[in-house]
A protein has these predicted regions:
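Charged, low-complexity intrinsically disordered regulatory/assembly segments
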Residues: 60-155
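Short, flexible helix-adjacent loops and helix caps
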Residues: 20-24, 51, 58, 120, ...
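Short, amphipathic alpha-helical segments
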Residues: 26-33, 40, 70, 74-77, ...
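Active-site-proximal alpha-helical scaffolds that flank and shape metal-associated catalytic sites
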Residues: 30-66
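Minor-groove-contacting beta-hairpin "wing" of winged helix-turn-helix DNA-binding domains
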Residues: 2-9
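Short, amphipathic alpha-helical interaction segments positioned at domain boundaries
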Residues: 9-38
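Acidic/polar low-complexity scaffolding segments in large eukaryotic proteins
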Residues: 1-2, 24
């Protein structure tokens, strides 16, 4: 990542072409598709928990989470830890056919560790390698790897 920089349309297309070649040369497309479907099961759960960190429903009204309720925050962190354990196994499976994905697990571990130590910004804050930021980046990487776009039916 380079702050202030982004790929051109041509650069994105070339990157996706190379990713498609990687899947074909390594013969890992089918396995990656299966793993991606499993990722899609976890994705809405991660997003739900990230939302629970940011917003609470009190008396039927959604309000920003001010993090004053330590029990609520502890429950949300516990949910994220359970999801993270599931994600770790899946990410390990992704790394076998696609070793370039190996950097995501340590980054997610680091973010979750910082949340556990009381640094709540590492849960969802943009601009940090927060759990949500890294998860989103992983999702974008998987979409590009498989030549997909969000909202194309299976995202």
């Amino acid at each position: 990542r380079f702050p202030g920089w982004m790929l051109t349309g041509h650069g994105r297309a070339e990157g996706e072409r190379r990713l498609a070649v990687e899947l074909e040369v390594t013969g890992t497309r089918a396995r990656t598709e299966v793993l991606y479907r499993r990722f899609l099961v976890l994705n809405p759960e991660v997003l739900r928990v990230a939302s629970a960190w940011q917003v609470r429903t009190i008396n039927g009204v959604d309000v920003p989470n001010d993090h004053a309720d330590e029990d609520h925050d502890a429950a949300v962190i516990a949910e994220m830890e359970a999801l993270h354990r599931r994600a770790e196994g899946l990410l390990a499976e992704f790394e076998a056919p696609l070793p370039r994905l190996a950097g995501y697990r340590p980054r997610l571990n680091l973010a979750l560790g910082r949340v556990r130590s009381g640094e709540g910004d590492w849960f969802v804050r943009p601009g940090l390698d927060s759990y949500h930021t890294v998860w989103f980046e992983l999702h974008e990487n998987l979409l590009a790897t498989l030549g997909r776009r969000r909202n194309d039916g299976i995202d």
